[in-house]
UniProtKB/Swiss-Prot annotation:
This is Probable beta-glucosidase J. Beta-glucosidases are one of a number of cellulolytic enzymes involved in the degradation of cellulosic biomass. Catalyzes the last step releasing glucose from the inhibitory cellobiose. It comes from Aspergillus fumigatus (strain ATCC MYA-4609 / CBS 101355 / FGSC A1100 / Af293). The gene is bglJ. One of its GO terms (cellular component) is extracellular region. One of its GO terms (molecular function) is beta-glucosidase activity. Keywords: Carbohydrate metabolism, Cellulose degradation, Glycoprotein, Glycosidase, Hydrolase, Polysaccharide degradation, Secreted. PANTHER family: BETA-GLUCOSIDASE, BETA-GLUCOSIDASE J-RELATED.
Length: 865
């Protein structure tokens, strides 16, 4: 990097640089130069810095044919750990991964709120609770910054659904905005001072977030005193002068749409002053300065790490995120079903057993160094000879990716050949050998999901070009195979020269590729085992598509294609086979759930149900084997109509590289579960508070539940959900006693000088080491409140590891303002009302709750962090 990368460069140096910049150079600095890099000014030593997605791994600069990376458990999994030290360590790992990818800025964490269970990106965020979200984000950011990399809080604010996300206006009261949706950002900024904040795609009360002065100028920078950079989400800038004047420093990606000549015109017409321009430039230069701590050169090559210590940390995180929802007694032994016995034969059933559901979809997805399925994790622990598998049913939304099962024609390597052309294929079809085109690029690939947003080649100047995918497929057994082709563009799939899938002539809009692609079109073909069947795809990029314009979605240039396939399954027969095996098995694990097919950026789920056939499978297995252990993988709640029948039940999320090992570690007792639900699991979709007002209607979504999000709604209305926020069992037992609450400076005029010190004694009353999570809630005055408030709200938490019989005092300090205040819309400030509050300390298990009174002596109004 150039001279500006000197650590500790002072404000005077930036002032000097600004004075030497030309007007054109200032304007150029305020937008990206390409998908992932900022603009450089070599003559002044201002380098380009690189950004990368986030939030659960550092992908690097390529969606298309990228370099593999470490994948962390998803956001809800990390939230479930309630472990700030662990999240800090994972932040350090992310920083190391960023440096390996040559990146200076990580686009994470995501700290939007899951106001309902259907949000496509719900898995990315930590929790439905703003305090848990904000404190977890502070730990995440601190860990990333400890490694010299800049984290980015996203998305400011109310990016809580994917439906029409760039067009929808979130209509939310000032009180709910402050108490629920902005509070995670407020706490994360207070706790970590991250170097960047990303604005959301949507409008907030009628105005896009990236040009919203009330959010950026008044709250973020004015009230909170935030000094970092504000950057747009990718293609999330919608104006020239309005965005600059509101405080949006950096438009991404490049080339610019709203800066460049358009901003020069705004300057010459006094729509934007040079003073404001200099303010935006200063923030970009400060971001470059801060990013220099990573010690990463400009445009550094991307490489892999995959270190043993990282794999160990990822395995720990996967195991510690698994929530034990139920663990009833085995009727024959009168002991809890879990942990299982590794000496017994284990039957593993279900669609997720042999599936590596390691991350959700969209910008959080990445090519992992490796993945571990639950079946593999169990087999590695118990020995392959001790594990039997039965499919039961499929769980995919789109057919499993075919790429790694193909072989190249030329060398027989795993994968396929991807050729790129500037000209369309001949009318007769390029697969017939009449193709006289010369490819401009030829790549060997294994991932048959090819998103071309960041693909580039010197001979390709626009978004319109063509490609072929070619390889052979040798099926393990004869039978009917189903193939699927999804495109943002056009595509034809041929098997042995026969057209099997036409996704060109007639196309149907779907949710693929961030909402700009088609549904998966499918076709069938009988294939013979041991025979090499020729697989060929003709593809045209997004401009060749026959689909109409997609309203409310982001268009990512050239589009992409996805090729899947598998043996066709008769679900009824497969379920019956699984049931027959389960009836005779020593112990049974049923792995079900969702995957990145079902939960992804670009679309919301239409319902909470598990994939077709799943509930039938679970019910049938439980009917013959009531002690079967059910493992659910999902990033957000799913319906479990069989939950009351199940005696042993785990929520395992998307566990990253080590997902399967983490599940196996908990199943067999190598990890004692300590995780708690960071989300409420309703019994059915209609029970959740956002049910009537989740989708965009005529360009708006009404946040009708107001402040009663998640458990606040269920506690206040007295409705019992399927599983409560904070629920999670352990193989150990714990006892809480001696709760004390002490207030410092109770009469201080400035409430920021006052805090609560909550102390409780925690004992491990079992013979097994285990970790207890103490949750601290505050109940407002029952009669004296001037506004309606939730029955209780989480205000702090602490996790403590205890040996058998060990007792420790756990102390949690909470700012009094955070503990007692609500947002008073009348005075546009936080108000802590005097009165009698109650502090609850909640531990694992029914009845493990202590309550102590707290008297707030004086009412106080406050603002800021």
């Amino acid at each position: 990097m150039g001279s500006i990368d000197t650590v500790g460069m002072g404000q005077r140096a930036i002032d000097q640089i600004i004075s030497e910049l030309s007007l054109n150079e200032k304007v150029a600095l305020l937008s990206g130069v390409d998908a992932w890099h900022t603009f450089a000014i070599p003559r002044l030593g201002i380098p380009s810095i690189r950004t990368t997605d986030g939030p659960n791994g550092a992908r690097g600069t390529r969606y298309f044919n990228g370099v593999p990376s470490a994948c962390l458990p998803c956001g809800t999994a990390l939230g479930a750990t309630f472990d700030r030290d662990l999240i800090f360590s994972l932040g350090q790992l992310l920083a190391a991964e960023c440096r390996a990818k040559g990146a200076h800025v990580l686009l994470g964490p995501t700290i939007n709120i899951q106001r309902g269970p259907l949000g496509g990106r719900g898995f990315e965020s930590f929790s439905e609770d703003p305090v848990l979200s904000g404190l977890a984000a502070a730990s995440y950011c601190s860990g990333v910054q400890d490694g010299g990399v800049v984290p980015t809080l996203k998305h400011l604010v109310c990016n809580d659904q994917e439906h029409e996300r760039v067009a929808v206006s979130a209509l939310v009261t000032p009180r709910a905005l402050r108490e629920i949706y902005l509070l995670p950002f407020q706490l994360a900024i207070q706790g970590a001072r991250p170097g960047a904040v990303m604005t959301s795609y949507n409008k907030v009360n009628g105005l896009h977030a990236s040009e919203n002065p009330g959010l950026i100028r008044d709250i973020l920078r004015g009230e909170w005193g935030y000094e970092g950079a504000v950057i747009s989400d990718w293609f999330g800038t919608y104006s020239v002068a309005d965005a600059v004047n509101a405080g949006l420093d950096l438009e991404m990606p490049g080339p610019t749409r709203f800066r460049g000549p358009a901003l020069m015109h705004a300057l010459t017409s006094n729509k934007v002053s040079e003073k404001t321009l200099n303010e935006r430039v200063r923030k970009v230069l400060e971001l470059v300065q801060l990013a220099s701590r990573a010690g990463v050169p400009e445009y550094a090559p991307e490489r892999k790490l995959n270190r043993p210590e990282d794999r160990a940390l990822l395995r720990r995180a996967a195991g510690e995120s698994v929530v034990l929802l139920k663990n009833d007694k085995n009727d024959s032994t009168n002991s809890p079903i879990l942990p299982l016995d590794r000496e017994k034969t284990t039957l593993v059933i279900g669609p997720n057993a042999d599936l590596a559901a390691y991350c959700g979809g969209g910008s959080a997805s990445l090519l992992a160094y490796y993945t571990v399925t639950p079946r593999q994790g169990i087999a590695d622990k118990c020995g392959a000879e001790q594990v039997v598998f039965s499919q039961g049913c499929y769980g995919h939304k789109e057919l499993p990716l075919l790429g790694e099962h193909l072989r190249t024609i030329e060398t027989g390597q795993p994968g396929y050949t991807f050729r790129v052309y500037t000209e369309p294929p001949p009318a007769s079809g390029s697969f017939k050998g009449s193709d006289s085109r010369t490819p401009v690029d030829e790549l060997h690939m294994t991932n048959s999901s090819a998103f071309l947003m960041d693909y580039s080649h010197p001979q390709i100047s626009g978004d319109t070009y063509y490609a072929t995918l070619e390889g052979t497929f040798e099926p393990p057994e004869s039978g009917v195979y189903e193939f699927g082709l999804t495109v943002a563009g056009t595509g034809l799939l041929y098997i042995d020269g026969v057209l099997v899938v036409d996704n060109k002539t007639v196309q149907r809009a779907g949710t693929s590729f961030f909402g700009i692609g088609t549904v998966e079109e499918r076709g069938e073909r009988y294939l013979e085992a041991g025979k090499k069947h020729h697989v060929f795809v003709e593809f045209g990029t997004a401009p060749t598509s026959n689909l109409q314009h997609h309203h409310g979605v982001v268009s990512f240039g050239p589009g992409g294609l996805r090729l899947g396939g598998c043996r066709k399954l008769d679900t009824d027969t497969a379920i019956q086979q699984a049931v027959q095996s389960a009836a005779q098995a020593d112990q049974v694990v049923v792995c079900v759930g969702l995957s990145g097919d079902w939960e992804s950026e670009g679309f919301d789920r239409p319902h909470m149900d598990l994939p077709p056939g799943t509930d039938e499978l679970v019910n049938a297995v439980l009917a013959v084997q009531p002690n079967a252990v059910i493992v659910v993988q999902s990033g957000t709640p799913v319906t479990m109509p069989w939950a009351d029948k199940a005696k042993a039940l785990l929520q395992a999320w998307y566990g990253g590289n080590e997902a399967g090992n983490g599940i196996a570690d908990v199943l067999f007792g190598d990890v004692n579960p300590s995780a708690k639900l960071p989300l409420t699991f309703p019994r059915e979709l209609a029970q959740n508070p956002s049910y009537l007002s989740y989708r965009s209607e005529r360009g708006r979504v009404l946040y009708s539940e107001d402040i009663y999000v998640g458990y606040r709604y269920y506690d206040t209305t007295g409705q019992p959900p399927l599983f409560r926020f904070g629920h999670g069992l352990s193989y150990s037992t714990f006892h809480l006693r001696d709760l004390t609450v002490r207030e410092t400076a109770p009469y201080a005029a400035n409430i920021k000088e006052s805090s609560l010190r909550v102390s409780v004694t925690v004992s491990n009353t079992s013979a097994r080491p285990g970790a207890e999570v103490v949750l601290v809630y505050v109940r407002p005055p029952a009669a004296a409140c001037s506004v309606g408030r939730p029955v209780r709200e989480l205000k702090g938490y602490e996790k403590v590891m205890l040996q058998p019989g060990e007792t420790r005092e756990v102390s949690i300090t909470i700012p009094l303002g955070l503990a007692t205040s609500f947002w008073d819309e009348g005075c546009d400030a936080w108000l802590s009302e005097k009165g009698l509050y109650f502090v609850e300390a909640v531990g694992t298990g029914e009845g493990n709750t202590l309550v102590a009174p707290l008297t707030v002596q004086v009412s106080r109004v406050w603002n800021g962090l």
